[in-house]
Design a protein with these regions (language model features):
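Acidic (Asp/Glu-rich) sequence patches and key acidic residues
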Residues: 1-129
Length: 129
């Protein structure tokens, strides 16, 4: 039990992501208990609503997130990506584990931006706990 976070890729022709057609998507990113990153998605993608729903992510939104991750890591400034409280969300400490997660997420998001065929696919974020 805990915060599990996913980005999935789905062919645009297959329609929006839903419980009924989830099997038609591919997981392209996964994080466990990285509550600071989840908080960013809730505030910037989910309009402040933390409801375990799936939300489409644009290339521009990923660029915004990449900028936050790069600045936070370069400046070692956790205020750019603050820990987010929640039930079974993991540690709220800003320690080496946190910075390792920021660096890993930065690399993952950069790869998603570069490697996604944006004409053919949509990306969606969702989390469960």
């Amino acid at each position: 039990m805990g915060l599990d976070m996913y980005i999935v890729k789905k062919d645009k022709a297959a329609g929006p992501l839903s419980d009924e057609n989830y099997d038609d998507s591919n997981d392209v990113a996964y994080w466990r208990k990285f509550n600071a990153l989840h908080g960013w998605f809730v505030e910037h993608i989910q309009n402040g609503v933390d409801d375990c729903g799936s939300y489409e992510i644009s290339k521009e939104q990923l660029f915004d997130l990449l900028e936050v991750l790069e600045e936070a890591y370069a400046l070692k400034d956790a205020s750019k990506l603050p820990p987010t409280p929640g039930f079974f969300f993991g540690s709220y400490e800003v320690d080496q584990w946190y910075w390792d997660k920021v660096a890993s997420a930065r690399d993952t998001i950069s790869s998603l931006i570069d490697d996604t065929d944006w004409e053919k696919y949509k990306l969606y974020y969702f989390a469960s706990w």
